[in-house]
Amino acid sequence: MDIEGHEYLSILSMPDAILTKFRIIVIEFHYLEKLWNKEFFNLAAESFNKILTNHTCIHIHPNNLCGISRIRGVEIPKAAEFTFIRNDRFKNMGPQTNFPHPLDFDNISKNAVILPECWFSNLSK
């Protein structure tokens, strides 16, 4: 799903019975740099929580065309493609820590963006 910012409301309006039929979901989430905005954060959190009820995020690939923002010391891709797999199809193999993945390719040939470590590392260490 790549619908330029409308993904959040689309997910929220989708009945759970339909969402759980998807074994694999790939969504490009836009406007992630707005996560510090309370209203947007609540919308995004509700959308992610709905997906994560029955799916697990197995990969995140930043869109380098959109760039990255640094807010309060946190690097946030402005748009990123998330891949989810339904939990009944997934065996937890532990976190991936090698990025970019060999199958990742930049959207454009300049200004590469690698997933910032804070998105996959254990910050409680």
Would you name each region that the model predicts?
Residues M1-A45:
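Active-site segment flanking the S-adenosylmethionine/decSAM binding pocket
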Residues Y31-K125:
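Rossmann-like AdoMet/SAM-dependent catalytic core
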